[in-house]
Amino acid sequence: RALTLAVGGIAAISLAVAGILVMNVMLIAVTQRRKEIGLLKAIGATSTDIRRLFFAEAIWLSFAGAVLGFLLGQFGSLLLRLAYPQLPAWAPVWASIAGIIVALITGILASILPASKAARLDAVQALSKK
């Protein structure tokens, strides 16, 4: 029971760090893509459209990270079972599914600030700044 709680705590910390990393990547993307966002707004994209674009990007980043994490975890479990056959190194299906869902939710929540920042950009200012 203590081991389960410890692993759960480590997983929670990992998800918090992952959320912060997704938010930082998205904030950098907003900064680097100011002109692109300005151009989209200049040709008629609404703030909602811009927000949706950044949410979609965050979902894809989070999904890719979740799937990669799942695959690496399965591979690590396999290696552990091969090295120590008597050790039950496997994750229940519900835990794997929950991990992927929580990773997606974390990514979406972490993208709220960057998506809002991108949606608030003014087209003229975004296109004129260097």
Where are these regions (language model features)?
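Interfacial loop-to-helix junctions that mark the boundaries of transmembrane helices
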Residues: A89-A91
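Short cytosolic juxtamembrane segments of multi-pass membrane proteins
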Residues: R34, A115-K130
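Transmembrane alpha-helical interface segments in multi-pass membrane proteins
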Residues: L5-M23, L27, R34-R81, A95-A110, ...
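Membrane-interface helix termini and inter-helical loops of multi-pass transporters
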Residues: R81-L87
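Conserved activation segment
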Residues: V93-W94, V124
